[in-house]
Amino acid sequence: MKSHLAALALLALAASLLGQPASAATVRVQAGQDLQAAVQAAAPGDTVEVERGFYRVNLRIDKALTLRGVGRPTLSGGQVGDSIRVTAPDVVLEGLIVRDSGTSLKDQNAGIYIYPGAHRAVVRKNDLTYNLFGLWIEKAQDVVIEGNL
């Protein structure tokens, strides 16, 4: 009887551990490094911290992660397309200067474009400047927008 209880307790513990998500990592990107490569290498749930600097990028985020600026880094789309395009749910963007989207009304170019299905995005404390649309949200639910300029 005791061995059965011990086995059940061990199975319950193993099942609870299997259900736990792996610990999220924090990746730090410095000016001059490839920000898109860092985002692609990140696992869902990770945080990518972007240090102060100028990044010429049309960033695509297709997994749940946090992109956090450290010291207000500037992400410039180079006046082509979207500066940041979010296609996954549960993405957090905070502390960034996002600028220089493209100018196509047909394509709805934006500094930050939240695509259909990118539910529960959080856009917090960013400066959106020199963009056709600072922030464009299309068919995404429960998006939080706080303290942006």
Locate predicted features:
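Positively charged n-region of N-terminal signal peptides that target proteins for export
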Residues: M1-H4
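Bacterial N-terminal signal peptides
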Residues: A7-L17
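Right-handed parallel beta-helix/beta-solenoid
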Residues: A15-A41, T66
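Extracellular beta-strand-rich solenoid/capping regions of secreted or surface-exposed proteins
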Residues: Q36, Q40, P44, F54-R68, ...
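Extracellular beta-strand repeat scaffolds in secreted/surface proteins
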Residues: D46-V50
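Solenoidal tandem-repeat scaffolds enriched in leucines and small polar residues
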Residues: Y130, L135-L149
